[in-house]
Amino acid sequence: MRRGLLLALVLVLALPASALAHATLEATTPARGAVARAEPAQVVLRFDEAVEGNFGAVRVFDARGARVDDGRVVHPGGTGALLAVGLKPGLPHGSFTATYRVISADGHPVSGGFVFAIGHAGAAPAATVGDLLGGTSAGPVTQAAFGLARGADYLAIALVVGTLLFGLLAWPRDAAGPAAEHAFARRSRTVLAAGLGMGAAAGVAGIVLQGATAGGTSFWAALDPGVVREVLGTRFGAVWGLRLADLVLLGGALLVFGPRRPGAWALPAALLAITPALGGHAATQHPVALLVPLDVAHVVAMSVWVGGLVVLLVAVPAATRALDPPARAVLLGATVTRFSTIALASVATLLLTGTVQSIVHLRAFDDLLHTAFGRAVLIKVGLVLALIALGAVNRRRSVPRLRALAREGHAPGAAGRLLRRTLRAEVALAVVVLGVTAALVSYAPPSALSAGPFSHSTRTGPLEVEATVDPARTGVNAVH
């Protein structure tokens, strides 16, 4: 029974705080492969969710590969799921290729294309959809850098929120003298400064890298002020810009009032924990009123756990060194006992929030084995399992031993060294888990992969072959 519950816990914890599905093209006007009798005024694309049409989102090319759209991309009727681009007047009869590169609600670019004709189907286009989109995708270095920026962003939130809550909930001021209190405060400020600096750097890099990814350009090209303005005009840019401003506000509050005045930092710290939900599908997928609070609770629980581990490793030892050896065990035992209880509550919160989110986002257990998203989850399963095992070692061995040493008036000794070793391993694993989480958000979950038409085009000699399966769901499908 215990093993089954542990496995369920690990599987749930391995799921991302907010599954990030990608937009899917559902229909087009003119239809894919259709022959329009008269020239349409515009090409319209309908997606399964609201998308953003920055960065030259929709383009139309004639058979020779020359652009024939007017470059003005709009949302018809203000509907976020619709995108349209006007066509230049007086187009000749023949085949045309429309391509799209849009931004999903989760901030990820989605691209594709289709062929249609006006009057009659003319010569096959000189370039395939893949050829026309080939120069508009970010390279592997940009994608890897974006993953690092996301991971650093998660770690920064954990460091800042976790350190503040550790000092408020887990630090036993009644067991610490002035010297220990001063040492703890000094090291805590160092952790907070590192988190704030990392968050600011990750935020700036993330905005630029989003411009490179969405526009299919290099990092250096995305430094252009025009590209940055376009990113800030998207939902992704608004959320990441808000987080940057919030980090500045929080840093100012901590600089003026210090971490011991929660009234000064509570609001910006809460906003920092809310922003991941605002930037993901929790804020756009039904039921929003349930998913957003769950996502925020998930982030706070993660921050308490991961940030608390860092404080235990960095700030608490500095505080104990300021005391006589017998008093060290008392302070260390009291701190670890409090944090152990809080960490257990955090794990329970992660279990609850992850369970509900998994019900919303996952379709079948087989998806864990047969999708990139699922395989990434399985990797995270192993890491989380190791993390829980190390925490169990501390709870079952280190905590009781430290309590006993405190009662007997002895120094922490071997128990303290064991605690430090396991904490180092836990922090290292926690950082890797956050990195895997950053990688997970680049994959669409199985629920998104199972919806919408699938199209693929290829060139065979002088012919271009395009196959479309619509709607690419279980049941009746049309193949064109």
Give the positions of each predicted feature.
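Bacterial N-terminal signal peptides that target proteins for export
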Residues: 1-6
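Bacterial N-terminal signal peptides
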Residues: 7-16
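Polytopic transmembrane helical bundles with strong interfacial aromatic enrichment
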Residues: 17-20, 24, 83-93, 97-480
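Short N-terminal segments immediately surrounding and downstream of signal-peptide cleavage
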Residues: 23-38
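Detector for glycine-centered tight turns/loop "hinges" at secondary-structure junctions
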Residues: 33, 65-66, 107, 462
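Contiguous beta-strand segments within globular domains
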Residues: 36-45, 473-480
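Short, surface-exposed alpha-helix to beta-strand junction/turn motifs within ectodomains of secreted
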Residues: 43-72
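Short proline/glycine- and polar residue-rich coil/turn motifs
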Residues: 74-80
